[in-house]
Amino acid sequence: MSGKSERLMSLDVLRGFDMFWIIGGASLIIQLSQLESLSFLKPLAIQMTHVEFEGFRFYDLIFPLFMFISGVTIPYSLLSKREKGVPVKKLQMHVIKRALILVIFGILYNGALQKGFADLRYASVLGLIGVAYLIGATIVLQSKSIRTHVLWLAFIVILISTLQLFIPVPGYGAGWFDPVKGINAYLDQKLLPGRLVSGTFDRLGIVCMVSASMLILSGYFAGRLLRFSKLSGSRKALWMSAAGALLILIALILSPVYPIIKNLWTMTFNFLSAGISLILLALFYYVIDVKKIGGKVFSKILFFFQVIGLNSITIYMATRIIPFREVSRFFTGWLVAPLGEWIIILGAIVIEWYFLYFL
């Protein structure tokens, strides 16, 4: 079944909104909250940091939301090409190549060229994206059956839940959710090469990579609804919102016995993240692609996020390599005394945006 292959503007804007907080938005809120006149921002500033271990804040959503959006694009990219006659084998090789590139970029991001490979951390944000996308995209490419895709999603949910809840770890038993006794730590120590960032486990490790593919597939099903369903745009947004609310409810109900922990990528964390991601996607899709709300100022805001969203991996790597804040300080350092450190961060965001705009 074919459908529209046009790229949804809301996807790029939502991805840009997501990346904005990583490249400086979160730090800007935190710095502004330190000003006496803006102290009311302190509760929001807390949301701009990760929880220490168990629980959930807004900033914990950034990574899984990106994964979810990557899944949403599959019907618009891979399936669109398959419909045009591109061989599945060629598409599969493209997915594998992309995964390898992301893994390599992740290793470079971790400082392979700077520090060498001795005591190097191989697990990375980009590596997890690459592996999880490889799993999700391969499932979609190797079968046209939606039923098969659903079964694979269910299998991943059951596999990770079973591992984390019921598989005993030698010396400790089953059902531990901590950095030492859990199945994540055990498998990372046995299978993951290099340094583990937390000593006994890595929050981007073996179990996490497989678990995160659930978000890719969840996004894929949302993408199928958006691209292929004959429902009206409003109905699509409503269905996504309802599904999102249901996933959030499931996560909260299960959380007393299956904790919401980002560092372990527990399935309750995935349910909660996917649920919020669905609601955000529904909101952005409804406002931008269905209602097409315009206005000069609003259009500029959308364009601001769209530029970031179209260059997400580029800006992620660039912020690691280019000292944007030091460049900003060169131009705005004289304003720190009268205004505060926030002006440096704001200047860095502006420089980053124009860097992407002129690429």
Residue ranges and their predicted role:
Residues 1-359:
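Alpha-helical transmembrane segments and their immediate juxtamembrane cytosolic regions
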